[in-house]
From Swiss-Prot:
Enzyme Commission number, as recorded: 1.4.3.5
Binding site for FMN: 60-65, 75-76, 81-82, 104, 139-140, 183, 193
Catalytic class of the enzyme: oxidoreductase
Pathway: Cofactor metabolism; pyridoxal 5'-phosphate salvage; pyridoxal 5'-phosphate from pyridoxamine 5'-phosphate: step 1/1; Cofactor metabolism; pyridoxal 5'-phosphate salvage; pyridoxal 5'-phosphate from pyridoxine 5'-phosphate: step 1/1
Assembly description: Homodimer.
Needed cofactors: FMN
Residues noted as binding substrate in the record, renumbered to the chain: R7, D8, E9, Y10, K65, Y122, R126, S130, R189, L190, H191
GO terms of biological process kind: pyridoxal phosphate biosynthetic process; pyridoxine biosynthetic process
Pfam families given in the database record: PNP_phzG_C, PNPOx_N
UniProt similarity note: Belongs to the pyridoxamine 5'-phosphate oxidase family.
Name of protein: Pyridoxine/pyridoxamine 5'-phosphate oxidase
Entry annotated with the keyword Ubl conjugation: no
Length: 210
C-alpha cells in the first residue's frame, strides 16, 4: 500500500517566539484552552512513551487530568506495563497532537507518583463503573475472554454497591518536565518549533530548525 501521495499543507497559524509565554506550563495551558475551544477531538489525549528493562520503547494513549506549575498529571494502574516501565526507568516522553489546529506538543521529563490522598480525591470523582473497572482489570495481564472480565466486575460491584475505594495499585503520576517543545505546522514544511529546556531553575526558550 503506497501512502506517499497523502499530504496536507499547513497554513492555519504561526508560532512566534516573541509571543510565547516565558514558561512552558503557561504556554501549554493557552494551547490546551484553544484546543478545547476549537472542539478538538479528545483534546486531553496524549501519547506516553516508556522504556522497559530491555531498553525497548513502548507507547500508548492516556488522558491528561491536571496541569499545574509542577507538571502534567495522569492516572493509571501502577502494576500495568507502563507502571512497570516507569518503576524501572522514570523518564518518559509525552506527545499531544491536535490536527485541527495543526499543532503538536512534545514533553520529556521524569514521572513520579503523586501523594495517595490526591489519587483518592480524583478516584472519588470517577464514574461508579470506572471505579469498578479499576478493581476488575489486572491491566496488561492476559485473560481468557471478555466474559471473565465482566464476571469479575460483577463480583466487585456486588462487594461495593455504593462506595468503591481506590485500589492501592491505582493512582496518579506527575510528569515533571525537563524539555517542552511546541510545534506549529507551516507551509512548505518550514514549521515553527519552539523548545523550552530547564537549566537550573530557569527555562531557556529557543527556536529549532524544522
Amino acid at each position: 500500500m503506497e501512502l506517499h501521495n497523502i499530504r496536507d499543507e499547513y497554513t492555519k497559524r504561526v508560532l512566534s517566539q516573541h509571543d510565547c509565554h516565558e514558561n512552558p506550563i503557561s504556554q501549554f495551558e493557552q494551547w490546551q484552552k484553544e484546543a478545547i475551544h476549537a472542539q478538538v477531538n479528545e483534546p486531553t489525549a496524549m501519547n506516553i512513551a516508556t522504556v522497559d528493562e530491555q531498553g525497548r520503547p513502548n507507547s500508548r494513549m492516556v488522558l491528561l487530568k491536571e496541569v499545574n506549575e509542577q507538571g502534567f498529571v495522569f492516572f493509571t494502574n501502577y502494576l500495568s506495563r507502563k507502571g512497570g516501565c516507569i518503576e524501572h526507568n522514570p523518564y518518559v516522553a509525552l506527545t499531544f497532537f491536535w490536527p485541527e489546529l495543526e499543532r503538536q506538543v512534545r514533553i520529556e521529563g521524569k514521572a513520579v507518583k503523586i501523594p495517595a490522598e490526591q489519587s483518592d480525591k480524583y478516584f472519588a470523582t470517577r464514574p461508579y463503573t470506572s471505579r469498578i473497572g479499576a478493581w476488575a482489570s489486572e491491566q496488561s495481564a492476559v485473560i481468557s475472554n471478555y466474559k471473565s472480565l465482566l464476571a469479575k466486575a460483577a463480583l466487585v460491584a456486588a462487594k461495593h454497591p455504593l462506595n468503591v475505594p481506590r485500589p492501592d495499585y491505582w493512582g496518579g503520576y506527575l510528569v515533571v518536565p525537563e524539555t517542552v517543545e511546541f510545534w506549529q505546522g507551516r507551509p512548505s514544511r518550514l514549521h515553527d518549533r519552539i523548545r523550552y529546556r530547564k537549566e537550573s531553575d530557569n527555562w531557556i526558550r529557543e527556536r529549532l530548525s524544522p
